[in-house]
């Protein structure tokens, strides 16, 4: 997912600040909810992520008085096409903004974000991805600790695509040093796709994970030689048709970008060499054509 501009998290609107302060004093978030929904740019293709990040950061900074509001927003079951779906998005940023050096607290917050990452609403998942990437430097162990913490997510259809989206964000890749953790996350996602039972092959979560794989691996292979080497190795061993197509797409994307010529060539060669041979029509029995 493209990085969004989230550098400005200070609330600039006096009306929003007053509404937020009122909600914190009273514990009644109805006016705040309505204000955020009106300003969300939803329904529409470009939700106001800068506002979601700013409101989330303000709620996180308020600490315990805001905890009930964040829980309320996170649990709101608003339809994807309504402005009130913005509130779980704000909750994602509030949770992410609360991540700090306390390992136990960070793990608990990450689990709450994981639950939001399983949401069927696409805009909520998008907000979770972006909020995670924003919080990555503040996770215990920094960006490398963050990537390692997301590896288990990659073994899940429900969370895997969100994890890959966050890991593939330029803000994460540019600061990542532990290439083995990147490989572990990508390999876990690939194994999840390959090992899925046939009955799960049309699962929406699996489809999202499969769609996320080429984007993330292309970005990660550009940044990490170990990921590029993983691509060449996996291309030689993968037998699953969907995964092979994803690997072919990664090779094409790297070729278009002019990146990793040695590894992408090795991957392309391995994919060609490991293709199933065409069926010999002379061996087909009558009635099987």
Regions found by a protein language model. Name each.
Residues 29-37, 60-77, 100-115, 137-151, ...:
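Amphipathic alpha-helical scaffolding segments comprising HEAT/armadillo-like alpha-solenoid repeats
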Residues 1-89, 93-98, 246-289:
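N-terminal alpha-helical scaffold/docking segments in eukaryotic complex subunits
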Residues 86, 90-139:
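Hydrophobic alpha-helical segments and helix pairs
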């Amino acid at each position: 997912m493209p990085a969004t501009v989230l550098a400005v998290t200070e609330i600039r609107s006096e009306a929003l600040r007053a509404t937020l302060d009122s909600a914190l004093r009273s514990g009644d978030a109805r006016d705040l909810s309505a204000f955020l929904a009106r300003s969300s740019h939803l329904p529409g293709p470009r939700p106001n992520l800068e506002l979601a990040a700013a409101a989330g950061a303000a709620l996180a900074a308020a600490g315990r008085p805001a905890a009930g509001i964040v829980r309320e927003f996170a649990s709101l079951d608003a339809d994807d096409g309504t402005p009130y779906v913005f509130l779980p998005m704000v909750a994602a940023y509030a949770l992410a903004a609360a991540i700090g050096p306390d390992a136990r607290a960070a793990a608990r917050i990450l689990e709450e974000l994981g639950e939001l990452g399983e949401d069927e609403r696409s805009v909520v998942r998008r907000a979770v991805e972006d909020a995670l990437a924003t919080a990555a430097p503040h996770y215990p162990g920094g960006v490398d600790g963050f990537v390692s913490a997301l590896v288990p997510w990659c073994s899940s259809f429900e969370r895997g695509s969100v994890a890959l989206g966050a890991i593939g964000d330029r803000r994460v890749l540019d600061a990542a040093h532990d290439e083995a953790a990147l490989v572990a996350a990508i390999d876990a996602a690939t194994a999840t796709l390959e090992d899925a039972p046939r009955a799960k092959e049309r699962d929406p979560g699996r489809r999202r994970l499969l769609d996320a794989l080429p984007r993330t691996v292309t970005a990660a292979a550009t940044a990490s030689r170990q990921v590029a080497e993983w691509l060449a190795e996996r291309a030689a061993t993968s037998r699953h048709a969907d995964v092979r197509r994803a690997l072919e797409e990664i090779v094409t994307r790297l070729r278009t970008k002019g990146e990793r010529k040695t590894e992408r060539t090795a991957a392309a060669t391995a994919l060609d060499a490991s293709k199933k041979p065409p069926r010999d029509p002379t061996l087909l029995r009558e009635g099987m054509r």
